[in-house]
UniProtKB/Swiss-Prot annotation:
Subcellular location: Cell inner membrane
Family membership: Belongs to the UPF0208 family.
Keyword tags: Cell inner membrane, Cell membrane, Membrane, Transmembrane, Transmembrane helix
Record protein name field: UPF0208 membrane protein VSAL_I2111
Pfam families (alphabetical): DUF412
Signal peptide extent: none
Transmembrane segments: 41-61, 69-89
Chief location of this protein within or outside the cell: membrane
Biological classification of the source: Bacteria, Pseudomonadati, Pseudomonadota, Gammaproteobacteria, Vibrionales
GO cellular component entries: plasma membrane
Top-level lineage group: Bacteria
Bilayer topology: Multi-pass membrane protein
Stored InterPro entries: UPF0208
Length: 149
């Protein structure tokens, strides 16, 4: 994906949400787990909240409160978009130096196990870390991962 453009952030966020491994070992180290959980919840619930907030005012014939209910509906609809936006920004953020070293160690460990990977990135981003973590949890056994988790 591209890291420029308004709509690409949402697309990158959705892709990153699908790529990030939902493992309990990662939850204390990264906020992604909580953001992904909240975003998935918002995708399911917030459209209903938006519709209910407008329909209740229409059913009770309260036209004076209709503008406020529309604002509430717009806010409710924006909640999942905010999650996708945050995830898209996070996916395209370059890793800090400590995580770059961890990324390289994991990459090397996966290569040593005999798995094929795309070439090592010199300036990896969080989406690259998500891909490597996915591969590590699928390819490596628990003893190889004990050092990090």
């Amino acid at each position: 994906m591209s890291d420029n453009g308004f709509l690409f952030r949402f697309k990158d966020g959705q892709t990153y949400m699908d790529t990030w491994p939902e493992r309990k070992e990662l939850a204390p180290m990264f906020p992604e787990q909580r953001v992904i959980k909240a975003t998935k919840f918002a995708v399911k619930v917030m459209p209903a909240v938006a519709v209910i907030s407008v329909l209740t005012q229409m059913v009770f014939n309260n036209s004076a409160a209709l503008p406020q209910s529309i604002i509430i509906a717009l806010f409710a609809i924006s909640m999942p978009l905010q999650g996708f936006w945050w995830l898209g920004n996070r996916a395209n953020t370059k890793l800090p130096p400590a995580l770059v070293n961890w990324y390289r160690e994991l990459y090397q460990k996966i290569i040593e196990s005999g798995a094929a990977l795309e070439p090592l990135k010199q300036r990896p981003r969080y989406k690259d870390l998500a891909n490597i973590l996915n591969k590590a949890f699928k390819q490596l056994d628990k003893t190889a991962l004990e050092r990090w988790f």
